[in-house]
Amino acid sequence: MPAIGIDLGTTYSCVGVYQHGKVEIIANDQGNRTTPSYVAFTDSERLIGDPAKNQVAMNPRNTVFDAKRLIGRKYDDPKIAEDMKHWPFKVVSDGGKPKIGVEYKGESKRFAPEEISSMVLTKMKETAEAYLGESITDAVITVPAYFNDSQRQATKDAGHIAGLNVLRIINEPTAAALAYGLDKNLKGERNVLIFDLGGGTFDVSILTIDEGSLFEVRSTAGDTHLGGEDFDNRLVTHLAEEFKRKYKKDLRSNPRALRRLRTAAERAKRTLSSSTEATIEIDALFEGQDFYTKVSRARFEELCADLFRNTLQPVEKALNDAKMDKGQIHDIVLVGGSTRIPKVQSLLQEFFHGKNLNLSINPDEAVAYGAAVQAAILSGDQSGKIQDVLLVDVAPLSLGIETAGGVMTKLIERNCRIPCKQTKTFSTYSDNQPGVSIQVYEGERAMTKDNNALGTFDLSGIPPAPRGVPQIEVTFDLDANGILNVSAKEMSTGKAKNITIKNDKGRLSQAEIDRMVNEAEKYADEDEKHRQRITSRNALESYVFNVKQSVEQAPAGKLDEADKNSVLDKCNETIRWLDSNTTAEKEEFDHKMEELTRHCSPIMTKMHQQGAGAAGGPGANCGQQAGGFGGYSGPTVEEVD
């Protein structure tokens, strides 16, 4: 059973598998190699991926996207407050954690970001299973290099809810470097800078790749809240203000109008990567008012100028941390859809004094490609060029504990190789202190109040002694997923305590995960029932219209009038029933099918026997579903702006 690699993106996700010595990026059921990270809830079903994004203008409040911008964060995070201005769906606080509120099948539901991400992961898993023809459980999932401990844990939980055994959480730029290194057959030692600007996150990593097989991350930097969506937001704000100026109407109060404007803005942004001007035309955008306008590339660049410039700060930081200067970088590799923006490319090129950028790998697929390679390695694949690959990654943030006066004492410095283990000895702060509280933080600031709290535990039972005498050994053990275990031991008694940092404030409990796993299975069953219902309905519709057409077009004398009327009456009665029972259950459609077949089959057989020898009419074979007549064998598709 192969293991798959999943790039779980903010706006789009992608899945790949390594087999027969190469990576296959797997297309979904719509034939697309990337799948929108969208989940929609309607009064009858749940949609994931392309179908969800396609109906977003009709159902903006119940179509959820950007779960990656919520995952592992607290509700009061200022970044979430900023995003909520742009989201049409509702985000509420549930014990300090963000939850997404939607209407599903007439009921109000609340979903954790992990659940929404797990639904996208389930879709990617099903895409791979359909292609490979077998069930899949093992996967490598990628995260931005700058994701913190709680965001990594939450992503792992999402995989678990989706029924995946997460072999490893790996960093997106590292995965992209793997794709680049293996694809290009690099010789010698090369310093490679990966510039990864996606839909919602931004990472820079510098790696040394030796002979295309040893991948050593030297440093990493980034912004987990910068990407294509932020550029869309600037354009949407600009267009909404232009609409207000022209027509004295503010469309921002209307979620549907705002969504149609966002879709048009996203399309214009893409156009501006290859043209210097984009035209926006939206009919009846708000209160019947059409909206036609043009946006030039120069105007778009001006709107996003500060955001584009902000991409260079992490590049400088990564270079400083790797102790390299610009001239030591051999290759600059662009990853992520937003690196197609010409201004982003030209700023980066100027920063590196005109050095050519490497555009040779597919920016949308490189991360999934690398994840698929890592999945194959971790599941023991020894084939071809991956057998010698060794990947050495680093910790994105410093980790430490709070000591007297709220000082952050670091045990693991950022950019240290992982897995890694560090031990330091501490002591008590006051005489006869019976216990110590170990408070764990991550971040770069000198005081813990400015850093991110990960968790706390108490070590009690310290024998009475003057301050500074007891020896308490604290060990930080950072595993290959970038997830932290902390232990503390009092040396005189040998008393020890340890925790895996689970960031209990922001993280799901085991009970919640178990509940979500069960719910995910229930939703999958409901989706399957819905699919079966639609199939049965389509079969009945197809059969009834075929029979009706056959009878109506039967040559004179082939069928007596009484039989003809009997069949037509039964068909029309069934069509009326279909129209008034659109939400009937599968069993009801099957029952109607049986009833109709029983009634029509003998008459149709008689008609065919009478016509035997002559050229047969349009044959609706008795009692069988006639394939794909008209548009009735599948769902009807409507285009939405």
UniProtKB/Swiss-Prot annotation:
The segment annotated Disordered runs over 609-641
Q: Which GO terms describe its cellular component?
A: cytoplasm; cytosol; nucleus; plasma membrane
* Top-level taxon of the source organism: Eukaryota
- Keyword Hydrolase on this protein? no
Biological-process GO terms, alphabetical: chaperone cofactor-dependent protein refolding; heat shock-mediated polytene chromosome puffing; protein refolding; response to heat; response to hypoxia; response to unfolded protein
What are the protein's UniProt keywords?
A: ATP-binding, Nucleotide-binding, Stress response
The annotated consequence of residue 241 to D reads: In strain: Z(H)1
Q: Outcome of altering residue 606 to T?
A: In strain: 3CPA126
Q: Where is the composition biased (Gly residues)?
A: 613-633
Q: Which GO terms describe its molecular function?
A: ATP binding; ATP hydrolysis activity; ATP-dependent protein folding chaperone; heat shock protein binding; protein folding chaperone
Q: Which CDD domains match?
A: ASKHA_NBD_HSP70_HSPA1
Described purpose of this protein according to its UniProt entry: Stress-response chaperone protein that prevents toxic aggregation of proteins.
The remark listed among the other comments is: There are 5 or 6 copies of the gene encoding this protein at two separate loci, 2 copies at chromosome locus 87A7 in reverse orientation (Hsp70Aa and Hsp70Ab) at locus 87A7, and 3 or 4 copies (depending on strain) at locus 87C1. Most strains have three copies at chromosome locus 87C1; two tandemly repeated Hsp70 genes (Hsp70Bb and Hsp70Bc) and one in reverse orientation (Hsp70Ba). Some strains, including that sequenced in the Drosophila genome project have an additional copy making three tandemly repeated Hsp70 genes (Hsp70Bb, Hsp70Bbb and Hsp70Bc).
Complexes and interactors? Forms a complex with Hsp83/Hsp90 and Dpit47.
What the record says about family reads:
Belongs to the heat shock protein 70 family.
Q: Which NCBIfam families match?
A: PRK00290.1
Can you name this protein?
Answer: Major heat shock 70 kDa protein Bb
